[in-house]
């Protein structure tokens, strides 16, 4: 049986590029997408060694349905690439009561990641890959209060928090499951020419960033490296080598908060309480 890789946000950008590369290397690719039309179109594009399952990362019922469908068809997963994410969106609250950026990028991702362990924990060299961003560096202190408060909401700041929290959660998860056969890695693909930035306003800062965007093929390389290397570097972020933006994959240190074990444990407990999975590990 082929190795199985599951990708969320698989119908565009880095997710789509990764899906194509995995398929070309013999993997069966499960495409997790919110938009059914786009998901089915991607399945057709990838070919017979792929299957689309609908998922909305803001909705735990949708995530549960996705997982149940996955488990009904596959008895194991070799790679889970948690890629789905949004940025610079107007303030809104999800069905689960989270601000939408954090609800999609962090809480939904964490919820699905923990569920995926059941299909991965006994699989040799299985790997969870979490998308992140150097945006995490802009955060200097942890925040737990007011995350659903529209009066203090900042699209960029909440996006930055979502990436820091995702990184910290991943490092802590990897530490907690060190006796299982599954490893966890974090990837920053660089600022690429993808649909993630489609809602960004044409500010001076954005126009400067736009000049330095790299192509998707450069961005996907760290994903493939982190998911297939036989010598995974723990508690490092895989990214393009040159200023985390250009060149071949390398690794670098995360925000220093990600190495604070007390802060990680606090975030871990806070997260499991918010997503209703206190007894998962």
Model features per residue range: what roles?
Residues 1-73, 78-80, 85, 136, ...:
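NAD(P)H-dependent oxidoreductase Rossmann-fold/reductase module
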Residues 90-104, 151-152:
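Short alpha-helical oligomerization interface
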Residues 90-94, 123, 140-142, 197-198:
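Conserved catalytic-core motifs of eukaryotic protein kinase domains, centered on the activation segment
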Residues 108-113, 127, 166, 219, ...:
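Conserved internal alpha-helix within the Rossmann fold of NAD(P)-dependent oxidoreductases
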Residues 133:
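Residue(s) in the substrate-gating loop at a strand-loop-helix junction
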């Amino acid at each position: 049986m082929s190795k199985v890789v599951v990708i969320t946000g698989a119908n565009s950008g880095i997710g789509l590029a990764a899906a194509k590369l995995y398929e070309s290397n013999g993997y069966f690719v499960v495409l997790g997408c919110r938009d059914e039309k786009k998901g089915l179109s991607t399945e057709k594009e990838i070919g017979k060694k792929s299957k689309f399952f609908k998922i909305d990362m803001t909705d735990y019922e949708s995530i549960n349905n996705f997982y149940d469908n996955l488990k009904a068809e596959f008895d194991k997963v070799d790679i889970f690439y948690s890629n789905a994410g949004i940025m610079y969106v107007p303030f809104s609250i999800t069905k689960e009561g989270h601000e939408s950026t954090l609800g999609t990028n962090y809480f939904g991702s964490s919820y699905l990641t923990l569920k995926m362990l059941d299909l991965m924990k006994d699989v040799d060299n299985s790997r969870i890959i979490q998308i992140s961003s150097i945006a995490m560096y802009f955060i200097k202190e942890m925040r737990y209060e007011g995350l659903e408060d529209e009066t203090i909401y900042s699209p960029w700041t909440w996006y930055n928090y979502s990436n820091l929290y995702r990184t910290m959660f991943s490092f802590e998860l990897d530490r907690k499951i060190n006796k299982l056969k599954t490893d966890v890695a974090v990837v920053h693909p660089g600022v690429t020419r993808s649909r993630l930035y489609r809602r960004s306003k044409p500010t001076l800062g954005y126009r400067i960033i736009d000049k330095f965007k790299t192509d998707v093929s450069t961005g996907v390389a760290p994903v493939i490296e982190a998911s297939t290397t036989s010598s995974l570097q723990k508690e490092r972020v895989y990214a393009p080598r040159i200023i985390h933006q250009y060149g071949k994959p390398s690794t670098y240190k995360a925000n220093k908060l990600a190495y604070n074990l007390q802060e990680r444990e606090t975030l871990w407990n806070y997260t499991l309480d918010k997503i209703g999975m206190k007894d998962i590990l």
